[in-house]
Amino acid sequence: RLTADPSLVHIDTWRRYIRDFLKACRYIKKAHPDLALNLYAHSMGGAIGGIAAAWEPDWFHKVILSSPMIRPLTDNVPWPAATGIALEKCIFGKDEEYVAGRKPYDGSGSFETSSATSKPRYERYKNLRAEHKELQTWSPSYGWLWASAEMSWYLRLNK
């Protein structure tokens, strides 16, 4: 982790995600050279997986990207304003602050206000998260938002 706050989703550069993922893939390919490497990735993992597959196209036998995060959601804040604020916060050393309106994990939340479609799955994961601090990542930092914006621009400019 790049921050001491276990609730904060923070990264210094989106390229770290790609490098870490490709390092894991390299290890798997070395350990199991006769097996095909298939990639299934969702949301931000879909963006990371898509870039990784573009950087190392010969590594993956099949690639499935489920709702890849081409651009992060910024709630009711327009994209140009959200990225401008994130850049300013990063320039002034506030990259590890929570994005406005976000807070640390506190265990609150309900199925009814979530985007989940399966109540048993929601409850199971909520209980796991409550029991395991390492699963309590919760809210993005301005650094994460800025890195995600840079990744978004990279994806759209390097089709």
Regions found by a protein language model. Name each.
Residues 28, 52, 155-158:
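Hydrophobic helix-cap positions at the C-terminus of alpha-helices
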Residues 9-29:
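Alpha/beta-hydrolase active-site loop
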Residues 137-159:
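Conserved serine/cysteine hydrolase catalytic core
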Residues 30, 54-58, 150:
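Short, well-ordered alpha-helices that flank and scaffold nucleotide-derived cofactor binding pockets
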Residues 1-4:
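Conserved alpha/beta-hydrolase
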Residues 32-43:
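Alpha/beta-hydrolase fold nucleophile elbow
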Residues 44, 48-137:
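Alpha/beta-hydrolase-fold enzymes
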Residues 11-14, 134-142:
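Short acidic-aromatic active-site loops that bind/stabilize oxyanions
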